């Protein structure tokens, strides 16, 4: 998850340079923005962005879209690139143009949208492992991977709603005695508007064997992203990050 944060750091660096007026030479800020794109994508994806060997966030998006039926340009398939990668790719290009144009405020709004979407595969991972732990006899491996996803998203959920974060933590923490996947899913979905994401973007946990959603893991139907709330959540997230992560470590 350190790469995830470094991607954001590079974009923030680009915006800092933009605000300082370094955009006058069109190099520093644009270069930092491009570095953010590189750390998001990696070198293995190639020109078409379709591979099973990727290692960074781009590949995580593609992997989770197959689990949640959000692949393809329309976001309704289990094959190909994640729709989120199409969407974020467009935002990368837009942000680059805005910085080159010196429109720092608009670039900030674009980064807010990118950051919100980057959290989606982490939320998908949290919900899928909650289901596997309760309904598919998941063991230590699933518990550890689920706890890892939770460690990455819990501060952001907490910034939106501490009660929702507590619900997720109680079910997914290392050493949890029981997991309630429906409670986890409901708690996460309740903060979608504050996180700036939608039900359609997240999808539902797909059972490829039956070509249906796992029971209780269907996509939700009502959520409207709010960019203002997303900005507030982003600011608050970093303030609680280390406290909540320490709680996860101490419970091990």
Enumerate the language-model features and the residues they cover.
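A cross-kingdom C-terminal cell-surface attachment/processing module
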Residues: 239-251
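Mature extracytoplasmic or organellar-lumen-exposed domains after removal of signal/transit peptides
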Residues: 1-224
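Exposed boundary/loop context
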Residues: 29, 139, 232, 251-252
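C-terminal GPI-anchoring signal of eukaryotic secretory precursors
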Residues: 222-241
